[in-house]
């Protein structure tokens, strides 16, 4: 839990404040998991999850759509890799959903184990797991980053990005 709390603090995920009149604070809970590493060692993980089912449409969220890469795009890229003997890599973005900036005004009760003023709540600045808009906000952050570093988004598939260089190119597929 300490690692997760430190990560949330470092990410500036929320700020403490008084709950404004007429607003409701979402509940949360800790989800615990045992993860086995490639070397066989067990690692214990804790993740703070907002109870997003308590969110109200039009108040806590409006749009939840986020694109996913098309299966035909995946097949096309894999066939290009096989036919041209290209290099293929797979990567994972750790705590991906926690990077999305929130546009809505969302409040959450303080998580168990957090040492803040008991009379205050957390005003979320960044997405947390469980929020209905978390995937959308992550995609927006990722899309902006890819465009800033010179990738082009494919018109036919908004989860396919391409960057060309003199002698080579990079195709990146975002798979949720």
Regions found by a protein language model. Give the residues of each.
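Long, low-complexity, charge-biased intrinsically disordered regions
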Residues: 1-176
């Amino acid at each position: 839990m300490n690692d997760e709390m430190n990560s949330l603090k470092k990410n500036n995920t929320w700020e403490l404040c008084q709950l404004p009149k007429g607003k409701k604070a979402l509940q949360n809970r800790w989800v615990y998991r045992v993860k086995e590493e490639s070397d066989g060692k067990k690692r214990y993980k804790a993740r703070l999850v907002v109870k997003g089912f308590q969110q109200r449409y039009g108040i806590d969220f409006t749009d939840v759509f986020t694109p996913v890469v098309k299966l035909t795009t995946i097949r096309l890229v894999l066939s290009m890799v096989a036919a041209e003997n290209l290099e293929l890599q797979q990567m994972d973005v750790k705590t991906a959903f926690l990077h999305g900036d929130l546009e809505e005004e969302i409040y959450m009760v303080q998580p168990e184990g957090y040492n803040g003023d008991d009379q205050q709540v957390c005003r979320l600045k960044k997405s947390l797991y469980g929020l209905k808009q978390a995937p959308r906000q992550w995609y927006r952050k990722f899309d902006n980053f890819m465009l800033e570093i010179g990738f082009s988004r494919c018109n036919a598939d908004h989860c396919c990005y391409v960057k060309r260089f003199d002698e080579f190119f990079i195709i990146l597929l975002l798979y949720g």
